[in-house]
Amino acid sequence: MGKLHSKPAAVCKRRESPEGDSFAVSAAWARKGIEEWIGRQRCPGSVSGPRQLRLAGTVGRGTRELVGDTSREALGEEDEDDFPLEVALPPEKIDSLGSGDEKRMERLSEPGQASKKQLKFEELQCDVSVEEDSRQEWTFTLYDFDNNGKVTREDITSLLHTIYEVVDSSVNHSPTSSKTLRVKLTVAPDGSQSKRSVLFNHTDLQSTRPRADTKPAEELRGWEKKQRAPLRFQGDSHLEQPDCYHHCVDENIERRNHYLDLAGIENYTSQFGPGSPSVAQKSELPPRISNPTRSRSHEPEAAHIPHRRPQGVDPGSFHLLDTPFAKASELQQRLRGTQDGSKHFVRSPKAQGKNMGMGHGARGARSKPPLVPTTHTVSPSAHLATSPALLPTLAPLGHKKHKHRAKESQASCRGLQGPLAAGGSTVMGREQVRELPAVVVYESQAGQAVQRHEHHHHHEHHHHYHHFYQP
């Protein structure tokens, strides 16, 4: 350390603040305290030449003389014994120091001092503690030199040079009396921190270890808080987290299925092939659907309205079905035929999303008999492969397509009236239908729906033709 602190002043850099000014030292100067510290060295010459600053530094809690009485730091080009520092303290207070570096010091309250005369700065106040009425210490608290909690030897050296310059410029030098000013710098940690060793290497290690230990802990706590806030995990219980996670997943799946049901179940459940649901299951699905397909509970009311008109117009068409059981089975099969049988005539998927209960749907159902003979060649598996939920919505396009075919195929439909009326007695009873399996029931209903569909739509078409096509 003696080698370091015996460097010339030109090697040591002057400590500057971010503003570029010199570092101001806040201290209250008293004549009695300084006289106790000063080694009496008097020189009859003037004090205009280079001055010598004798330094005794206390680093940490152990005292270590940086310069001492033997090793002195030369601040000028001349020999240190020829031109010692002589400071003449003025009898009055001096308020001539106003430095830009005063912001870097903490302002401390100044209690009453036993000394009568002291040097007081403009804005800075420091504590003055009197010990044994013979010594006086000035305590000034500094911020971190490098703003990183580390104090280096170069910082202390430059700080001592700054103290020397500030004191030299702030005191009036009297040519009559010469006194030597001895500055004692003590660098000590705060009382709240742990004890540090005298060496700066140990100080650096101890100052960096608490930060390295506490920083990951604080980051971990902050991360736990961030995790607890959105997910609402309680404490650090790792057993509750998987349960909550699985519960959220199940809830999301249920919510998704609910929205899929609201959007329309026919878009997500395929009704193709032999694995399709039965007629009883299909009758349960449409009540969930809001608009695209009407449920069976609403279809008989809409279907009875056109059915009653041909009964009043053509009462002779139902002469083979006079018994109440036959009429009931005929109406039941006819209603199912209007829904299931209409799917055999759909060839274009352009008119989806329209309702069956509208008048266009009724007209489309009436104008479809020309394609009836082609449905006899379709296999029952092809009947199963058509979706009843989508096909009734395609009806409105049919009556526009088949208007021109209605007149051409009217004779063929009338030719089929006799065999279809004769085959009307082959309607199965309700008991026989219930005994069959689901797929067989669907096939038999599809076959009966074709026959009843032809017969039913023939008469409706006849009624429709007389009312709408006659000029």
UniProtKB/Swiss-Prot annotation:
Domain annotation EF-hand: ranges: 131-166
Tissue: Highly expressed in lung. Also expressed in brain, heart, kidney, liver, skin, stomach and testis. Within the testis expression is found in the seminiferous epithelium and round and elongating spermatids.
Gene3D superfamilies (alphabetical): EF-hand
GO biological process terms held by the UniProt record: axis elongation; cell differentiation; convergent extension; negative regulation of canonical Wnt signaling pathway; negative regulation of Wnt signaling pathway; positive regulation of MAPK cascade; positive regulation of non-canonical Wnt signaling pathway; positive regulation of protein catabolic process
Biased composition (Basic residues): 453-471
Cystine pairs: none
PROSITE patterns according to UniProt: EF_HAND_1 (PS00018), EF_HAND_2 (PS50222)
Subunit: Interacts with DVL1, DVL2, DVL3 and PPP2R3A.
Protein family: Belongs to the NKD family.
Descriptive protein name: Protein naked cuticle homolog 1
